[in-house]
């Protein structure tokens, strides 16, 4: 998320001007690069960037159609299947519709675009429409890789370079962790917890950091913790116990939770689950969904305004079929949930959940490599 800050915190001043002059509520078309799927995990970066942009929009802007890039619009570029999976991931991350830049240069015959991109999109259209309609009014839930709204106005030093004001250099840890099933919701209005790295902490004042720790669970990596120590802010927390693993745990006098972990994604399956347990502890055990067994997948729970779980999307981030996913669900409802597995081109499957305390454990069917499916929660 080392995205440019040169345009400010958000685009709302421009949208406000449009609305004043026209009397019409604007539409949003956020972008974030990702021109081909030769390195498909790069769509995670764009999806997380879209989520942040969507969450910063004025609430009356409800038509949000990210641009899916196809530049240079040749047969050697983005794959038809990749285009469809990308569509679903961006819908999961907060888009309400989609726009495509896939013909613009028209290097290929029109029949090629029809037989490839448009034929594939047609096969996924009903699936995408059902997902968007079912999840209307809900938002992605999980952890917020935090970027301060005051970041563009920070005091910059020579260490930041001439363009320090334009780039955050923060949050790059999020992309590899997203592929390990860490549920991320950048700029969520009610995140389960806040994630910080050293660049983010350096650009925040003491008051903002203390206020965050009072109202949210905080997750830090080692370098971020060191910056807090340098500023004397670690004096506001006290060591405590927590789940097994390498994480360190602290609490504030107000009862806030702080977990110090490693953001290194080059870890074992056991370490992945220990990391999620530590993050869940920091959240006060409020993560909406957790993949319990090892999987390299993006997990996107959607939550309603009352905090109840609306759906859980899964995107397989490998080229191998995943035999199944075992997922812990926190539905926010009393009674057993009704769960339905939805997978494009397949019949819906009713899933059986088993109670584990206040949580529910469900195991899904298989999912092909680089594919997308979701669970409707009722």
Positions of PLM-derived features:
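Generic recognition of long tandem-repeat/solenoid scaffolds
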Residues: 259-261, 310-314, 358-365
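Surface-exposed beta-strand/loop patches in extracellular or lumenal glycoproteins
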Residues: 317-335
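Catalytic cores of secreted or luminal carbohydrate-active enzymes
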Residues: 259-290
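Glycan-processing catalytic domains of CAZymes
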Residues: 1-214, 222-270, 361
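Solvent-exposed beta-strand/loop surfaces of large extracellular or lumenal domains
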Residues: 339-360
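C-terminal beta-strand-rich structural cap/linker in extracellular carbohydrate-active enzymes
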Residues: 217, 356-378
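Surface beta-strand/loop "capping" patches
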Residues: 131-151, 285-320
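Short, exposed beta-strand/loop patches in secreted or surface proteins that constitute
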Residues: 211, 247-252, 299-303, 349-355
């Amino acid at each position: 998320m080392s995205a440019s800050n040169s345009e400010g915190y958000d685009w709302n001043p421009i949208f406000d001007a449009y609305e004043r002059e026209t009397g019409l509520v604007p539409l949003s078309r956020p972008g974030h690069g990702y021109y081909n799927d030769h390195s498909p995990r790069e769509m995670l970066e764009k999806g997380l960037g879209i989520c942040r942009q969507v969450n910063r929009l004025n609430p009356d802007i409800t038509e949000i159609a990210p641009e899916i890039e196809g530049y240079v619009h040749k047969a050697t570029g983005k794959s038809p299947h990749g285009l469809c999976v990308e569509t679903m991931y961006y819908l999961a991350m907060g888009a309400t519709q989609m726009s495509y830049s896939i013909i613009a240069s028209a290097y290929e015959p029109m029949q090629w675009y029809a037989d490839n991109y448009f034929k594939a999109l047609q096969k996924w259209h009903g699936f995408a429409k059902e997902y968007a309609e079912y999840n209307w009014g809900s938002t992605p839930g999980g952890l917020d890789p935090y970027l301060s709204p005051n970041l563009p106005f920070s005091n910059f030093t020579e260490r930041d370079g001439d363009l320090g004001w334009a780039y955050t250099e923060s949050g790059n840890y999020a992309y590899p962790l997203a592929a390990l099933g860490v549920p991320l919701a950048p700029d969520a209005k009610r995140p389960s917890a806040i994630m910080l790295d050293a660049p983010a902490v350096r650009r925040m004042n003491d008051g903002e950091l203390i206020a965050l720790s009072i109202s949210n669970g905080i997750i830090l990596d080692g370098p971020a913790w060191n910056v807090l120590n340098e500023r004397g802010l670690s004096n506001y927390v006290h060591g405590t116990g927590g789940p097994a693993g390498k994480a360190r745990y602290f609490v504030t006098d107000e009862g806030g939770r702080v977990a110090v972990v490693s953001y290194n994604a080059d870890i074992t399956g056991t370490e992945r689950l220990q990391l999620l347990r530590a993050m869940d502890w920091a959240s006060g055990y409020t993560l909406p969904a957790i993949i319990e067994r090892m999987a390299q997948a993006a997990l996107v729970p959607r939550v309603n305004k009352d905090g109840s779980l609306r759906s859980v999307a899964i995107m397989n981030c490998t080229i191998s079929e995943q035999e199944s996913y075992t997922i812990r669900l926190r539905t926010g409802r009393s009674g057993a949930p009704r769960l339905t597995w939805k997978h494009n081109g397949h019949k819906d499957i009713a899933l059986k959940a088993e109670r584990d305390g206040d949580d529910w454990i469900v195991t899904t069917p298989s999912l092909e490599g680089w594919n997308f499916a979701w669970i409707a929660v009722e």
